Each structure stands twice: as C-alpha cells, then as structure tokens.
Amino acid sequence: MAQILDQQNTLYEKLIAEKYLLLSDEEGLLFQQLSELDYFMRSEIIRFWLNQMGCAVPNESQMKEIDKSFFQSRQGANPVLKFQRDDGQNAGVVLSKYNNYLIAEKLDE
C-alpha cells in the first residue's frame, strides 16, 4: 500500500510540475490561463511556483485570500497582496498582477 501511495504522490507532483511549465515563463504565471483552472489546481500550481522561488507557501486561509483578490475580483483590478508564514518558512512574498501575469516578489528580510 505504501508503494502505491508513493507512486501516486510522484505522479501528482509530476502533473503539477508539467502544468506549471505550461503556465509560466520568466515573467511569472500566465494569469488568463491560470484563471481558467479550477480552484484546487490553481492553488497547487501557485504553491508549487512559490516553493520553487523559495517563497513562503500559502496556507489554505491565505490561498483563499489570493483566490478572492486575484481571481474573483473585477476584470480590470490590479490587486497587490503581501503575506508571510508565522512559522518563518521561506521568505515572505508580495503577489501582484501586471500585464496578464501573476508576479511574485520576495520580501526583504
């Protein structure tokens, strides 16, 4: 059973990594394509992306705030959201939307 779970986890991680590569470039994440995904997949890709950058990975409450601010706001909105983890996990981050990209910048520590 443990072997099956390991294989499923590996497959899941590969799926997220492949989706991430399709939705990202050096500027950030492609906002329009990201917004077409369901909440769960979008959340996992954002978490993967931030982790790859060495930034804090949002908990579920923070992820809901990201989703509300960026993906449920009016079309022309350009929100900026700053967060960090209380546990000090990785660097804090500022998320913003610019030129159809979701952009992350590490907070100075």
What is the predicted role of each segment?
Residues 1-109:
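AMP-forming adenylation/ATP pyrophosphatase catalytic core
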